[in-house]
Amino acid sequence: MNRTVYFADRAVAFTAEAPGGAWYAVAAEACGGISRAKILNFLESHNSVAVVSDDPDRAFAAFAAECTPVEAAGGVVVNDCGEWLMIHRNGRWDLPKGHLECGERIEECAAREVEEETGVAARVVRPLCETLHAYYFPKTARWELKRTHWYELHASGCAGLTPQTEEGIDSAVWCAPREVADNLRDAFPTIRCVAAAMGRN
């Protein structure tokens, strides 16, 4: 699959071939794209939708043009004991992340968001992957397409966790591998993608 956009727990892939399995395949329109309205309609009855096109990049671009682009960064913070830093945000397990600020480098954003959301100072080790997340933002009455750049980061020590409660975070914890696996069952698919990228690299 060329690109996958997540709508909370549901996914839309833009691909050249129908993937089969649990994916519900739909053909791109004659213009090469597909409207956001049609995608949302398909997602009402299917968890995974594949938009099949001879030019998946064009189909994705047509969809993306109907959304406001947002850049963000976050990461998997690993301490000296091999534990991961996870947060519990709005009822789901998550990883620290947030929007890119004006004039900020994307790696700087990842480290800043980690510190703001958890109180942990960490340094970027390497890039991991990117995820795409589409959502409706009521304050501006618009759809946004958030591209999050994910990194592995390292932090020394295990203390000093301060969850940013104003961002809906009720806890920040260091998790051993078994705890990470358990928590990922109650995380959004984008977070599971990041965990998989950690395992591949």
Spans of model-derived segments:
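Conserved beta-strand and immediately adjacent loop positions that scaffold enzyme active sites
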Residues: 74, 83, 171
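Acidic, metal-coordinating catalytic segment for phosphate/diphosphate chemistry
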Residues: 33-74
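Short hydrophobic/aromatic beta-strand or adjacent loop that forms the aromatic wall/cage
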Residues: 2, 72, 146-150
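Active-site beta-strand termini and strand-to-loop segments that position acidic
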Residues: 77-80, 153-155
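Acidic surface patches and DE-rich sequence motifs
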Residues: 7, 79, 88, 137-138
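Unchanged
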Residues: 100-188
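Nudix hydrolase/Nudix homology domain
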Residues: 5-7, 16-24, 28, 159-201
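Conserved Nudix-box catalytic region and its N-terminal flanking loop in Nudix hydrolases
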Residues: 23-26, 78-116
